[in-house]
A protein has these predicted regions:
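Class I SAM-dependent methyltransferase SAM/SAH-binding core
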Residues: 70, 76-123
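Conserved alpha-helix/loop element of class I SAM-dependent methyltransferases that forms part
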Residues: 47-67
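Conserved catalytic/acceptor-binding region of the Class I
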Residues: 156-226
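N-terminal, positively charged/glycine-rich alpha-helical extensions of SAM-dependent methyltransferases
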Residues: 1-38
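A short acidic, Gly/Pro-enriched loop at the edge of an enzyme's catalytic core
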Residues: 123-133
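A short glycine-rich, Lys/Arg-flanked "PGG" loop and its adjoining helix->strand segment in the class I
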Residues: 146-157
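A short SAM/SAH-binding and catalytic strip from SAM-dependent methyltransferases
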Residues: 131-145
Length: 286
């Protein structure tokens, strides 16, 4: 299979996972700026990674206090900050200029964090320099024929690839049922509910891809069931940062959100309790 076909198949699989076919068709430039218009919303609404999960990831990856980390797609620094608190030196790569600005603001108290506005694909490789390559809900955006080889090459001997994942927060099923008609009217492709088993299967597939790359071994996967409560405004803000919603026509998205808001205000109290899986997958360079 040609690299271009393999890349398209990879993005198609990711598109299936994230309920939008647009990712498979987007150009590299479009993927680079995918979150730019919602960078502030992403910073405000995306769930954080539990401290327990981060602490355990540091333990499994055996990161010492002087460890150097390369972070791929840091966004506004949601995962960067908890790792920076350990005192690690972190080089962060982020393709969105808007997200870079937020990351620099959020990480201003951590002088050991360096943020560069570039993609992992375009970054000039520094071989065998890093103790870990970190990607927090971002590695699926990297072209597969580049990502695993480049990550392995950047790592020192016995270095670790650390993939963090926050799956999409789901409302209670009865709330989903109340919203179903709105989705069927305005965005039928998004009218799905992710049960825990579905999210576990998505994580399993991502982990298997790491091993199938032939660049890493000894995959360790752990997960936590998490909850986060949103106001109606913040829940809609969260949805606005998810790829399936970003891919919608703006008018369709506005109509969808108006319908969702109306139902939520009619059926919910001021808050929505959501649940999701937060996980890490750590594998060692071969």
């Amino acid at each position: 299979m040609k690299d271009s076909e393999r890349t398209k198949n990879w993005y198609s699989e990711v598109a299936t996972t994230y309920a939008t076919g647009y990712l498979a068709l987007a150009t590299s430039e479009q993927r680079k700026n995918w979150y730019s218009e919602v960078a502030d919303a992403y910073n405000r609404a995306r769930p954080r990674y539990p401290k327990e999960l981060i602490d355990r990831a540091v333990e499994v990856a055996q990161l010492h206090k002087d460890a150097t980390i390369l972070e791929v797609g840091c966004g506004p620094g949601i995962a960067t900050i908890p790792f920076a608190r350990f005192g690690f030196s972190i080089v962060c790569l982020e393709p969105s200029q808007e997200a870079c600005q937020l990351a620099r603001q959020n990480c201003a108290s951590y002088p050991s964090v360096e943020i560069t506005n570039t993609t992992f694909e375009e970054w000039e490789l520094e071989a065998e320099k890093f103790d870990a390559v970190l990607a927090a809900t971002s590695f699926h955006w990297v072209a597969p024929e580049i990502g695993y080889l480049k990550a392995a090459t950047a790592l020192k001997d016995n270095g670790s690839l650390i993939l963090l994942w926050n799956m999409t927060p789901q409302p209670p099923y009865e709330v989903y049922q109340a919203l179903h008609e709105v989705y069927q009217t305005h965005a039928p492709s998004l009218a799905r509910y992710e049960e825990r088993g579905t999210q576990e299967e998505q994580l399993r597939r991502f982990g298997q891809t790491v091993i199938d790359s032939g660049r890493f071994k000894g995959l360790v996967s752990e997960q936590l069931a998490c909850e986060v409560t949103y106001s109606i405004d913040d829940y809609l803000l969260l949805l606005s940062t998810l790829s399936p919603y970003i891919a919608l026509d703006p008018q369709e998205r506005n109509s969808l959100f108006e319908g969702l808001r109306a139902v939520l205000e009619r059926n919910c109290t001021r808050s929505i309790l959501t649940s999701y899986l937060s996980a890490f997958q750590i594998a060692q360079k071969i």
